[in-house]
Curated annotation (Swiss-Prot):
UniProtKB keywords: Coiled coil, Metal-binding, Zinc, Zinc-finger
Organism in which the protein naturally occurs: Ostreid herpesvirus 1 (isolate France) (OsHV-1)
A Pfam entry, by short name: zf-C3HC4
Record's signal peptide: none
Protein's UniProt name: Putative RING finger protein ORF9
Zinc-finger found in the keyword field: yes
Domain of life: Viruses
Length: 592
């Protein structure tokens, strides 16, 4: 009895009728004739006893079509080897000229990275909707004289800026040409081959063409994201009626995820060369506008802003200085040195005050508030939270006074934001950005109990005297600060009693500002702390070299050795580890 669907001579496995015209297949792959298939009392296969329900009786039952393809299958099985070999040869011949000759060890292209729309807020306050498409462009190598089909990425952007009518509604198209990179590094060189900006307002298209003067960078590809680092800025000049308006694409490095869940500014600290920065020390008769890009010099968090800084120098007491990786202004007033940065936005209507690491700072050098952030704070975001200067006459109109004494006086008199308002703003921001909880910036001072609440668990504190007496332990931060004041020392050391491996975690709390600012989050107690003051120096007393890979969740900058932050972040860039930066008057910690 031949009952299988794959048999050459089909017969019904129930009535044994041969030469069936209509064959229905049951789940066990045995064949039955149409009359037997529709009989209501028959629901088991007589061969293997498998139950089935006819599709006519149950519309949800699987429809097994009765195809009689035994002869076709046999013919295919006999000739399968010959046909497969012929198809493979034809496929290789057809695809060979279209396959890009890219070494997979040098570059790994992202997959399915086409038509991904991602909403992104740049540090300049522009809203960008990215649409990336990928193609291939032939490139001739000078040494090998061969044509390589290198990836060509085109980025379509829609730029919106509520504060600048010129940028409103413009479409930006950027094309990047990828060239070869170092083997195994994952990075390859790239250059801008095409940049165009078109005004697409509803009132009618107004084509605006721009010329690209330069732009060479590096691109790193992975299967899920594309990262681009711009090594030189792209000055773009308008050739239309907007000839007076010049601007730069100052996004040096961006990271795009396929799903669009993570998109934030990122920067490598050492891609700018020193020759791009020159100090401004020449005497000036009045305010002068200086174009610069201010970004963070710590932790790889970029804050690339197109800003205008007012510079003025009177009797060698005030000067504007641009140093290496950051922009700083030192004001000497009565022997007291204050280090602030006054940056004016591109529209020239408002000031923004930044500290040296690119975070908005409000207050004096002893007290202040640093806003937590998920993305790098933009001028538009900062302007929405609070205003820096108190009196508007300092920033509007021709009577604007840009002297630093007046600005600092207004700045010192400015009342700080109330603690309840700051907490409410922080909690609201945390609720809206739960997935970025590890990318926070926190600031604590002596009276921080109401900020801490139940979120932060302080383990223990201890205070040491100058004469190295036995330290007193306490779990109350206020008591620890009182002990510090009583003993007359400016250094309070905190120690977690939890031992991890063969080390104990030590955290240095700075109290030199007189306020007793401190930090120690309980959720960081699961890792080790790398305190630079605890490193064993060399025999000659010099600072030791840092290890190649720092696998410590917390890095603390001490006063014993002067380490450049770039030396540390180089080893932690692309790693989900915490970095703690100790300044003279406040502490920050954030996630790279």
């Amino acid at each position: 009895m031949a009952c299988s669907k794959m048999s050459v001579d089909l017969e019904c496995c129930i009535c044994l009728e041969e030469d069936i015209e209509r064959v229905d297949t049951i789940p066990c792959q045995h064949t039955v004739c149409r009359p037997c298939y529709l009989k209501p009392m028959i629901n088991k296969c007589p061969v293997c006893r498998v139950r089935w329900i006819a599709r006519e009786r149950d519309p949800l039952a699987k429809d097994y079509t009765g195809e009689h393809y035994a002869h076709t299958y046999g013919f295919f099985a006999v000739n399968i080897d010959e046909e497969s070999e012929e198809e493979e040869e034809e496929q290789v011949i057809e695809e060979e000229p279209q396959t890009p000759e890219i070494d997979p060890e040098e570059i790994e292209l992202p997959r399915r990275f086409v038509d991904e729309r991602i909403e992104y807020f740049l540090a300049t306050g522009l809203r960008i909707d990215y649409v990336l498409t990928r193609g291939y462009c032939p490139s001739i190598q000078a040494d090998e004289q061969e044509v390589l089909y290198l990836p060509l990425y085109t980025i379509y952007c829609n730029a919106y800026d509520a504060n600048d009518d010129i940028l409103h509604g413009q479409e930006i198209e950027i094309t990047i040409q990828i060239t070869r990179g170092e083997c195994g590094s994952g990075w390859c060189e790239a250059q801008f081959v095409y940049v165009s900006i078109t005004d697409s307002e509803d009132s009618g298209p107004k084509p605006i063409t721009h010329s690209v003067k330069g732009g060479i960078g590096a691109v790193r590809f992975s299967r899920e994201e594309i990262e681009f680092e711009l090594q030189t800025p792209l000055p773009i000049e308008s050739r239309t009626s907007y000839s007076h308006f010049e601007w730069e694409i100052t996004t040096p490095y961006f990271k795009i995820n396929q799903t669009g869940e993570e998109l934030y500014p990122w920067a490598v600290l050492d891609f700018y060369e020193e020759e791009f920065w020159e100090p401004i020390v020449e005497p000036l008769d009045g305010p002068v506008d200086v174009d610069m890009s201010s970004y963070s010099a710590i932790g790889g968090i970029a804050s690339m802003l197109r800003v205008t800084a007012a510079a003025r120098r009177d009797n060698d007491e005030q000067y504007n200085e641009i140093i290496g990786r950051h922009v700083s202004r030192k004001v000497l007033n009565g022997g007291a040195e204050k280090d602030y940065i006054y940056l004016r936005e591109i529209n020239g209507k408002e000031f923004s005050i930044y500290d040296k690491i690119g975070n908005c700072f409000v207050g004096t050098n002893k007290t202040g508030i640093t806003l937590p952030f998920t993305h790098v704070p933009s001028p538009a975001a900062i302007r929405g939270n609070h205003h820096i200067l108190k009196e508007p006459e300092y920033i509007y109109g021709e009577e604007r006074d840009t002297s630093y004494e007046t600005a600092l006086q207004s700045f010192d008199d400015w009342e700080l934001i109330k603690r309840e308002e700051l907490l409410q703003r922080r909690y609201k921001r945390e609720e809206q950005n739960l997935k970025y909880t590890s990318n926070r910036l926190f600031y604590f001072e002596k009276e921080f109990e109401e900020i801490m609440e139940d979120k932060w668990a302080i383990e223990s504190y201890m205070c040491e005297d100058d004469d190295n007496t036995k330290p007193e332990y306490t779990t109350d931060m206020r008591v620890a600060c009182e002990q510090r004041d009583r003993h007359g020392t400016d250094i309070v050391k905190c120690r977690l009693d939890k031992e991890v491996g063969s080390r104990r975690m030590h955290t240095l709390i700075d109290g030199e500002s007189g306020v007793g600012k401190s930090f120690l989050a309980g959720h960081l107690s699961r890792g080790l702390v790398f305190d630079l003051d605890w490193i064993t120096p060399n025999e000659d007393g010099s600072k030791p070299e840092l290890p190649e890979d720092l696998h410590y969740p917390i890095i603390i900058l001490g006063k014993r050795f002067d380490y450049d932050m770039r030396e540390i972040t180089k080893r932690l860039l692309y790693k989900k580890e915490y970095v703690v930066v100790k300044l003279s008057y406040m502490y920050f910690f954030y996630c790279i």
